[in-house]
Each structure stands twice: as C-alpha cells, then as structure tokens.
Amino acid sequence: DENADYTSSDTGDIRQIEAVTRILGNEFGMDVAQFTSRENMETRAAIKEQFQRGDRLQAIVAIKCLDEGVNIPGIRTAFILASTTNPKEYIQRRGRVLRKAPNKPYAVIYDFVTLPRPLDSVSSLTTEQAQRDLTLVKNELARIKEFGRLSQNSMYANNLIWDIQEAYHITDEESEEGGFEYGTD
C-alpha cells in the first residue's frame, strides 16, 4: 500500500533504504529517490511521474510502499533485496515490474535469496544446527521455484535450487512436500 507506514520495528528497513540510496547515488552516480512513508503524497506523485517519464530518475528505492496499489508500469528492472515469504506480497512485487507498458517488451527482476549462511559452510553444521535453518531455507526454495517457474532463464533458478538442496541434503520429494529432513552429520 502506497500509504504503508513504518513502525519502530522497521528501523532496520530504514537503514537498508538509506544504505541502498547512498550506494546507488554516491558510488554509482545514479539519480535515485526514496519512496517511503516519510514522503508526503505530493512528493510520491512527483517521484512516480519523474520515474515514469524517464527524464530524471534512474531508480526508486522502496520498502513496503510499492507492495500494493501503486501503478508504475514503466519499471523495467527491479532488485528485490528483502523479499517476503508471503506469496501474495511477492506475486504483487513481481507483478509491479511485469506490467505491460509502451516500449517495454520485457522486464528483468533480480530477486536476492536470503539464506542463513553460505552454502559451502552447511556441511560443517550439526544436524540440530541444520534443522534450525530449514524453515527459512524451505521458504526461500518455494519462492525461488515460483519465480523460476515463470522466468525465461529458469535454468539459473533450477541450479540454485539444486545447490541448496544438495547442501542441506533435501531430496526433490522433500522439497515438493515441504517436509524437509536433514541427512546425517
């Protein structure tokens, strides 16, 4: 919702927005704007218009405010840095980018996967440690499968799924059922 507001638990999100804005603006020299609950409705409307026209803004940095009810069909590329495991929310985020628009034959989505640790370190975990990871891993696998299923480059998603399943000793059947059981130490 464009009117979504922050709570005190969202200070990490605010820091992340600030960091991404700083990196894109200062390190990459891009013209970016934040689209958050801190901007008033008039400012948000101006940001959407400038981005849609393509005459100034190269990127919009947002958390929550672009989830539902915001229409910016000109978005061609999205970097989803902090994705949700809520299917409705990630389908809306994907749909936000995939909307048809003039001179937009396709869109590119970079969806960053969040795992509890690097895959090459999983082999050193105890069974109990790996079990604690599995809820997040399971949710990320489901999201990767959903995004990959409809993408033009599904082989990348399939390779990542295979790497994750191999690291955590998750079979295809367990992955499909969602009933993951970690192998032996």
What residue ranges belong to the model's regions?
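Short, flexible helical or helix-coil boundary motifs
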Residues: 151, 168-171
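Conserved RecA-like P-loop NTPase helicase motor core
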Residues: 31-158
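Short helix-loop-beta junction
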Residues: 22-30
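A conserved mid-domain beta-alpha-beta active-site/ligand-binding segment of alpha/beta enzyme cores
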Residues: 156, 164-167
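Short coil/loop linkers at secondary-structure junctions
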Residues: 30-31, 171
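The feature captures the C-terminal accessory region of ATP-dependent helicases
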Residues: 173-185
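Conserved strand-helix element at the start of the C-terminal RecA-like helicase core
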Residues: 1-21
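Glycine-centered helix-coil hinge/cap
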Residues: 16, 25, 133-136
